[in-house]
């Protein structure tokens, strides 16, 4: 099919771009919206069920308000991390909704089955069973349930969205944030009174708002390294290692809570906080690397006439991008601003596809993706043509 257009089936660099034929938009899967509706309705049903069965309705409402406030803060951090190559909003929403519905439902059902299979409840067996359920079974089940979304992201066209470590961290974090949001509502709502609910909220929302996102991040890191491998065994190794790290971290967190305040605070200060600081450092470094990838790919794009030198000047800076979109919107209205945004996104996606090829991961699927991204970029340029023409003399702000 490629040969009929005069292109070789495999290419080495941007020199193949001029023969890619007429532009056409990248295909969009139409199952996303119905799936989002289904998962969203499931989340809503879970919330309604929590309210109807709550022992403390006032505490549940309080939990909803406080958990939502904490969740907004967590999401804001991940959206900041996702600025250089913003992920499709529909997939971000699906990640959060999966965490707050599908993962929660799977965890509840499986943990109930495990709990019912434990031996009879003598005084000693009760304590042992509780520890096994909370510190062993729950981490194993919940991290697997949350991780299913990341495994789904590794399939089909969704794989093209996992370009960098940042992408894996963002999807893992949003899935964990969704799970934590609903779990926090339930735990806070189970307090015997408002004071009890506030105490639980303090422990969960002040000390551990990033707990579940952090656990799932371990698997997200495993997914990223698995995607960098060629062999199946290597991929499986990194996936299992990431999953084991998520389970271990989750188990230590849950187990320490059962062993008294001293143990809990010790694990929190000596184990959780250093790991959290390490992940934050890793995330910021990955975000910085995204900027460098785009900057490195803009130069060849200029050489091959895909972008102009002026465009390359503002495409490599987040503040300059925002200002360019704002200028386009001011001069040409919302349509012009949206068109320039799409052009920016197309350039970024092409840069990441090209980066993977340059790092030696070029195969038929990736070259086909590059073909699609070039065509999408050409279509976006045509749509944004008048706005880009008006930006022809634009220079990014200095500093």
Can you annotate each of these PLM segments?
Residues 5-7, 11-399:
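Hydrophobic alpha-helical segments at protein termini of multi-pass membrane proteins
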């Amino acid at each position: 099919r490629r040969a009929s257009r005069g292109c070789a089936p495999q290419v080495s660099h941007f020199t193949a771009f001029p023969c890619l034929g007429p532009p056409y938009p990248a295909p969009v899967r139409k199952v996303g919206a119905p799936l989002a509706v289904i998962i969203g309705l499931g989340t809503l049903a879970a919330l309604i069920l929590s309210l109807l069965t709550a022992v403390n309705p006032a505490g549940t409402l309080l939990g909803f308000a406080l958990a939502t406030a904490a969740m907004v803060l967590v999401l804001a951090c991940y959206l900041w991390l996702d600025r250089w190559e913003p992920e499709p909003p529909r997939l971000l929403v699906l990640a959060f909704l999966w965490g707050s519905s599908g993962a929660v439902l799977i965890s509840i059902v499986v943990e109930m089955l495990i709990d019912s299979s434990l031996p009879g409840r003598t005084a000693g067996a009760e304590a042992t069973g509780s520890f096994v359920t909370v510190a062993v079974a729950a981490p194993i089940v919940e991290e697997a349930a949350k991780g299913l979304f990341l495994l789904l992201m590794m399939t089909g066209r969704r794989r093209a969205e996992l370009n960098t470590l940042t992408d894996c961290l963002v999807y893992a974090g949003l899935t964990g944030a969704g799970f934590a949001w609903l779990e926090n509502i339930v735990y806070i709502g189970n307090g015997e009174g408002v004071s009890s609910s506030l105490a639980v909220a303090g422990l969960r929302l002040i000390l551990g708002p990033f707990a579940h996102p952090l656990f799932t991040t371990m698997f997200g890191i495993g997914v990223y390294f698995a995607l960098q491998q060629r062999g199946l065994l290597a991929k499986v190794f990194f996936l299992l290692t990431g999953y084991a790290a998520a389970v271990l971290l989750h188990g230590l967190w849950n187990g320490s809570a059962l062993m008294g305040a001293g143990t809990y605070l010790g694990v929190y200060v000596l184990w959780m906080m250093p790991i959290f600081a390490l992940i934050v450092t890793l995330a910021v470094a990955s975000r910085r690397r995204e900027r460098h990838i785009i900057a490195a790919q803009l130069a060849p794009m200029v050489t091959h006439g895909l972008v102009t030198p002026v465009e390359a000047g503002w495409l490599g800076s987040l503040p300059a991008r925002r200002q360019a979109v704002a200028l386009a919107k001011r001069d040409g209205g919302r349509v012009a601003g949206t068109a320039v945004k799409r052009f920016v996104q197309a350039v970024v996606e092409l840069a990441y596809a090209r980066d993977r090829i340059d790092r030696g991961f070029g195969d038929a699927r990736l070259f086909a993706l590059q073909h699609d991204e070039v065509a999408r970029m050409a279509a976006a340029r045509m749509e944004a043509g008048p706005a880009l023409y008006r930006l022809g003399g634009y220079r990014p702000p200095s500093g």
